[in-house]
Design a protein with these regions (language model features):
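C-terminal catalytic/substrate-binding lobe primarily of soluble NAD(P)-dependent oxidoreductases
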Residues: 22, 151-377
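Conserved glycine-rich Rossmann-like NAD(P)H-binding loop of the short-chain dehydrogenase/reductase
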Residues: 28-39
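NAD(P)H-binding glycine-rich loop region in Rossmannoid oxidoreductase-like domains
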Residues: 39, 43-115
Length: 377
């Protein structure tokens, strides 16, 4: 049973520890949960800032519904950072529901998000609990841009792009878990929203995104489809939403695109255990260990949304830094609202819809993590 109101599940992982950083910064007590208490303690001592001033406990548990339910009981909010979420997320979602906890996670995996909506959305709603996947840089920044665009009357069609800069000659500075999620995209369908229906992207889909922030177009991919088409499918303001992701100053997207096409041609019909081995090999070869903490001089982001109506058009842009550090900040911003019992929506929802895009943007702006601009077109 959790001693404190917030549980961070996956506390020895990169994103979990950055979430803990921000909880400590906001003086929020927490229960750090992982499969190995020893590893959680060791990693937190190495990586977590201001740990000496924190109020917390460390709990070891197995990754089962029964075990996690017992650990989550007593808490109000669970921050789940254990991925790939397609593989591990549903167990934590079921456990949080049984324990009577709100659930935030950091996924960007559209297939998982769709599964959460269908399997748990109504149950969380009836329980008065928030189920908010993708409470993270990907794709809350793009959704903030989309919401800013939707402030213009008449906008009903959205195109969004999430453009990131990381390590120039490496795997874009992503974590081991993120890399596993990326290669795992080859196994699932990717969708965009068209006339209120989710439509599958072709396997070969790619975009050359043009933005005035850059001299050259940025090669981008659907990247599982992102969470935005799912969130906006049930939003009466939006008829269509197409989203993409690109890494500028880095060729990683072209490598990923090649892998996805190779998967379609050679691997898609192999037995599951063979596919698992292929994905593990790809992850190990590109991201063998936890990356260092992000630097503001290296990790910079541009997320924008172009909104169009019959006669209106607008472009909203969110400039940001340090995507994973910003993810920890977004988790903590959401936790702060939930601990005070403040939410605009329960059940399956996005962070923007539950807590307000203006609140999230303000939280980021005041901590030097993002700024936004809006331009009428």
């Amino acid at each position: 049973m959790a001693k404190y109101p917030v549980v961070v599940y996956g506390a020895s992982g990169y994103t979990g520890m950055l979430t803990i950083d921000w909880l400590i910064d906001q003086n929020i007590p927490f229960t750090a949960v992982g499969r190995s208490a020893k590893r959680v303690e060791e990693m937190m001592k190495q990586r977590v800032v201001r740990l000496e001033s924190a109020t917390y406990e460390i709990v070891e548990t197995e990754h089962t519904v029964e075990a996690l339910t017992k650990v989550f009981q007593g808490a109000k909010v669970v921050c789940n950072t254990v991925g790939p979420f397609v593989q591990y997320g549903a167990i934590a979602a079921e456990a949080a529901l049984k324990a009577g906890c709100h659930l935030l996670d950091t996924t960007g995996e559209q297939a998982y998000i769709l599964d959460m909506r269908e399997r748990f959305g109504e149950s969380y709603r009836q329980a008065g609990l928030v189920l908010a996947p993708s409470t993270s840089y990907m794709y809350s920044f793009a959704e903030i841009a989309a919401e800013l665009a939707l402030e213009t009357p008449g906008i009903d069609c959205l195109e969004t792009a999430t453009l990131c800069r990381g390590t120039r000659f490496a795997a874009a500075g992503v974590t081991v878990g993120s890399t596993a999620s990326i290669f795992g995209m080859a196994r699932v369908k990717q969708h965009y929203l068209w006339e209120k229906k989710l439509v599958e992207h072709p396997v070969t889909a790619s975009f050359n995104v043009v933005d005035p922030n850059f001299m050259e177009p940025v090669f981008s991919l659907p990247w599982s489809g992102t969470s935005l088409p799912v969130f906006y499918q049930t939003d009466s303001r939006v008829r269509s939403c197409i989203s993409s992701v690109g890494f500028y100053d880095n060729d990683v997207m072209k490598l990923a695109h090649g892998f996805f096409q190779k998967w379609e041609a050679e691997f898609k019909d192999l037995p599951a255990e063979h596919q698992d081995a292929i994905i593990k090999g790809a992850v190990d070869s590109t991201t063998p260990s936890m990356p260092p903490r992000e630097r503001t001089t290296t990790v910079r982001t541009v997320d924008f949304a172009i909104g169009r109506g019959q006669l209106s058009a607008v472009r909203a842009t969110v400039h940001g830094i340090t995507a994973y550090i910003s993810t920890g900040a977004l988790q903590t911003a959401a936790v702060t609202k939930l601990l005070d019992g403040e939410t605009n929506k329960v059940g399956f929802t996005s962070a923007c819809k539950a807590f307000g895009h203006s609140y999230l943007l303000g939280f980021l702006e005041q901590r030097g993590l993002a700024r936004a601009t809006v331009q009428q077109l």
